[in-house]
Structure formats: structure tokens, C-alpha cells
């Protein structure tokens, strides 16, 4: 017998299989590196704005080895026009830490990821679930919207973020984690959009 939690999760990944935005550039050739760059670029920025910046960035720095040689100025130059330049500076700082502390290998645990500048719980969860296919919750703006509406969580309450993290963790399945994570972000961006 399926629980309400399983029904929610399976509905999300079934929706993704039929309607998901699989043509986005960061959903091709998926790696921890490409997920990281896309997630940082997508913070507080619309998908349509990010696409050309992501494409240019990946053309110049297609992998962590290429990025490891980049100067902060080169990264900032590619970021020009995207805004929120602190994100680009965090990418530079994080790649330096990865080079020194992780032998230029992308971290693969939650604790390692959140130790890097600019990577919080949700970005770490996205990297782990999308690139590594590990069961980790995420809670970006789109996911907050989906879960808060589904479970009638009042976002104006102080404890709402903790409640949403608990629900996100509860709903995050152990199977089809890639489809679920991409799906819940897409549902929030396309169906359950901002009012």
C-alpha cells in the first residue's frame, strides 16, 4: 500500500517523465561540476536569463580542471550581466578550496559541499541528488512553493522554513531521486508558479 508520501513523490517523478524540461543545457552531460555551476547561476535568477551565461561559462570552463586554472577576473568577466557577483566570487573561492583540500576532485559528501563558499543545504542537496543520485532534500524557491501549497504551510510563520525542510526530507524518495529532484523544481517553476 502506497503512503501519502510515496504518492506525492511518485506523482512528481511521473510528471517529470512526461512534462519535465529535459532540454535545459545543464540537464545534458550531467556532472557534479555542471550541477554546481547551474545551481549557483540559478540562485535568484530566471532560467531564460541563465541559459546563455551557462553556455558561455561551460564553453570556456567545461570541467573542474579548466576552471582550476581560471583567475577571478576571468570568472567575473563571464558573469558580467548576470548580476549578484558574490556568486562568481564564491565560485572562485570554492574552486581554490577544491584544488587545495580535495586534490581538484569535486566533493561528494554533504559536509564537504556545505563547507564550500556559496553552497548551502539546498545547493548541496541538488548536487548530491542530481549528479550523485543520492537521496538528499532540496528547498529552493520553487520547491518551497510546491510543498507550502501542497501542505498548506504559511510562509509568513517563523517556523515555516524548518517545517518545509522536514517535509522536503519526508517527500524525498530513495529511488528515482534524479527525476524527483528535477521534477519538483520544474513543477514549481512551470505549474505551481508565483502568483
Please annotate each region the language model reported.
Residues 2-6, 11-195:
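Catalytic cores of DNA base-excision repair glycosylases
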Amino acid at each position: 500500500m502506497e503512503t501519502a508520501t510515496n504518492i506525492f513523490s511518485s506523482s512528481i517523478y511521473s510528471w517529470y517523465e512526461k512534462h519535465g524540461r529535459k532540454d535545459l543545457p545543464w540537464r545534458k552531460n550531467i556532472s557534479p561540476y555542471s550541477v554546481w555551476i547551474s545551481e549557483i547561476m540559478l540562485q535568484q535568477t530566471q532560467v531564460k536569463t541563465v541559459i546563455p551565461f551557462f553556455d558561455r561559462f561551460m564553453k570556456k570552463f567545461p570541467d573542474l580542471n579548466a576552471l582550476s586554472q581560471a583567475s577571478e577576473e576571468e570568472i567575473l568577466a563571464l558573469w558580467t550581466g548576470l548580476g549578484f557577483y558574490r556568486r562568481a566570487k564564491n565560485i572562485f573561492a570554492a574552486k581554490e578550496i577544491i584544488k587545495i583540500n580535495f586534490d581538484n576532485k569535486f566533493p561528494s559528501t554533504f559536509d564537504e559541499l556545505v563547507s564550500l563558499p556559496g553552497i548551502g543545504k539546498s545547493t548541496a542537496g541538488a548536487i548530491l541528488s542530481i549528479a550523485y543520485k543520492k537521496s538528499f532534500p532540496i528547498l529552493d524557491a520553487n520547491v518551497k512553493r510546491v510543498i507550502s501549497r501542497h501542505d498548506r504551510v504559511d510562509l509568513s510563520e517563523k517556523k515555516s522554513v524548518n517545517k518545509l525542510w522536514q517535509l522536503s526530507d519526508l517527500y524525498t524518495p530513495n529511488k528515482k531521486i534524479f527525476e524527483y529532484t528535477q521534477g519538483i523544481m520544474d513543477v514549481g517553476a512551470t505549474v505551481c508558479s508565483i502568483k
